[in-house]
Amino acid sequence: MPSSTSPDQGDDLETCILRFSDLDLKDMSLINPSSSLKAELDGSTKKKYSFAKKKAFALFVKTKEVPTKRSFECKEKLWKCCQQLFTDQTSIHRHVATQHADEIYHQTASILKQLAVTLSTSKSLSSADEKNPLKECLPHSHDVSAWLPDISCFNPDELISGQGSEEGEVLLYYCYRDLEDPQWICAWQTALCQQLHLTGKIRIAAEGINGTVGGSKLATRLYVEVMLSFPLFKDDLCKDDFKTSKGGAHCFPELRVGVFEEIVPMGISPKKISYKKPGIHLSPGEFHKEVEKFLSQANQEQSDTILLDCRNFYESKIGRFQGCLAPDIRKFSYFPSYVDKNLELFREKRVLMYCTGGIRCERGSAYLKAKGVCKEVFQLKGGIHKYLEEFPDGFYKGKLFVFDERYALSYNSDVVSECSYCGARWDQYKLCSTPQCHQLVLTCPACQGQGFTACCVTCQDKGSRKVSGPMQDSFKEECECTARRPRIPRELLQHVRQPVSPEPGPDAEEDGPVLV
């Protein structure tokens, strides 16, 4: 049975360093959980690895806690994970141990990596008498409760109510800045979101924080206030960095807070491609003028400018800037390979990059700049989110895809995509109806009425077989649409720009995107 160690125990980084002062954390092979390797480790190293794993386990369980109205009055705890509700600590521990071993392993690795960084720099920091902003403000304690808002003046129902689509709100934000102790930030963010009854996803790394959370407007307002007053972020974040949209806690199945190597998964170490060397930021107004100039050119294929969509194909499929180059890639981690494979396309070009909220462009533009082939690289500050706030009827047509249960936000009436079955204009995604398939499909009401609710012929056939019972667990995704899609497409040197009002046609695509 996993340890029930409280996540608060051992969170003080100095305590960890004192206990593990002789551990060579640079040798990351030590964290391999294989039994054969464990047998080769000496007792001291086993003990140290065990401590890190217990901490990772406790932090993971902590992120699965869900607030209840009674939690304000008593110490009752509930946990929600994988769409299941757990009422006792034993059951949630058993579930995490059996179903989330990989996540615990990666969290353990992250803890050890962060300790390695701290250990390697602690002596130099001490000799230089450099100050850590967090330690300066918290000289006596790293207790996260010191940085939680006072909500005693609010009725608990005020934080919970108003979470519906009309009254609630979803925040989207990121902040690139060096963080010395991501694990502490993780524990603090978990406690903060639980206190405010927020759900969502928050990624934390040594390079910063990236979050999207939903709840009542009171809860999101308090969250922003806390973030703007926190010592590590107050000089890097402003209120305008938080993009807002209608929604609430219901937009996310649960709260997920974790520590990763990157705050957006590009697949390249931040040490190799840093956020500190991005493309030039353009305000929505400046970007609008650049796009207007680009579209006014008689022959855009011969232009020295490329309008580049940094998102995945299923995002640009339902909304995009007119004349953009929208890579047919499924994940942002494919973007570097896409650039490498199409490097000549960008040679001597001015590149205007954009994404949903701006975060992918930060390191994406840094990667493109590092190739040394572009004239200039620009990025849309605040992303499509901020552009549409200022120009709802501008050059962006269609819907804005979002990574939550809303799937898309609408700022204009344009429909730029079509039903995968009949070609009628349609842009409302639904999950493929086949069990265990996590792809999205565009199928209009008429086609849905005829039973066409899967992402491809293979999945449609699976649905008709209605596999259930023990066999369902081994009924793996085998989508034709994914199998036939090139992982990294090669563009023509004179790329075909994307239209904004495609005519319906019989040759509709049958491929639906994977929701990641």
Curated annotation (Swiss-Prot):
* Keyword set, alphabetical order: Phosphoprotein
Q: Which residues of this protein are catalytic?
A: 355 (cysteine persulfide intermediate)
This protein's record includes keyword Calcium:
no
SUPFAM superfamilies documented for this protein: Rhodanese/Cell cycle control phosphatase
Q: Is Transmembrane helix among this UniProt entry's keywords? A: no
PROSITE patterns given in the database record: RHODANESE_3
> Where are the residues of the annotated region Disordered?
490-516
Q: Where is the Rhodanese domain?
A: 301-396
Q: Which domain of life is it from?
A: Eukaryota
- Locate the compositionally biased regions of type Acidic residues: 506-516
Q: Which residues carry this modification: Phosphoserine?
A: 269
What InterPro entries has UniProt attached to this entry? Answer: Rhodanese-like_dom, Rhodanese-like_dom_sf, Rhodanese_C, TrhO, TRHO_N
* Record protein name field: Thiosulfate sulfurtransferase/rhodanese-like domain-containing protein 2
